[in-house]
């Protein structure tokens, strides 16, 4: 099982990725984790990436694809892999195809932006314990305070509505086009590609977690 999980920030990809990886016995591959590991290990690509990052630049797609290809040689990838947060852009998707990275499924978790904004902007956190609440779906017994300690809850900057909207804008411009890219490739094929087209699946990411997970596994049959 080799797949890419697509969906907006806050669509619940992280939760479903965990279930998919457990069910199929595959690793979740995050480019951030890969970069940190390569830099720490001092691999040739890691050294190159560190130079760019130390200068405040963005690591090039060539370096990222090189890291991906190295990572896929590891023994834990023999049953497959799940890409989390990658590819983010069309050039990255093209580079993956060109590099012959095989993908069986592209699964989109579709959640309306209004629902994501409500989901994320309603989160409240007790910093010391990490306990999380939601003003609508999982409210504390007393508004604004932690159930166990009575200490104040905060809204993280990442969860503030204007921040969420900005992240959704970036997703719309950069990552959303991947949905069309993969659905077109799945539908029409590409005779020049080194790998077979993936199957493209889209599920609704609204409702309780168990229902969404059931939809995910049904889509991956």
Curated annotation (Swiss-Prot):
GO MF term list: adenylate kinase activity; ATP binding
Localisation per UniProt entry: Cytoplasm
Annotated region described as NMP, given as residue ranges: 30-59
InterPro entries the UniProt entry points to: Adenyl_kin_sub (IPR006259), Adenylat/UMP-CMP_kin (IPR000850), Adenylat_kinase_CS (IPR033690), Adenylate_kinase_lid-dom (IPR007862), P-loop_NTPase (IPR027417)
Pathway in which the depicted protein is active: Purine metabolism; AMP biosynthesis via salvage pathway; AMP from ADP: step 1/1
Domain notes: Consists of three domains, a large central CORE domain and two small peripheral domains, NMPbind and LID, which undergo movements during catalysis. The LID domain closes over the site of phosphoryl transfer upon ATP binding. Assembling and dissambling the active center during each catalytic cycle provides an effective means to prevent ATP hydrolysis.
Name under which the protein is recorded: Adenylate kinase
Organism of this sequence: Cupriavidus pinatubonensis (strain JMP 134 / LMG 1197)
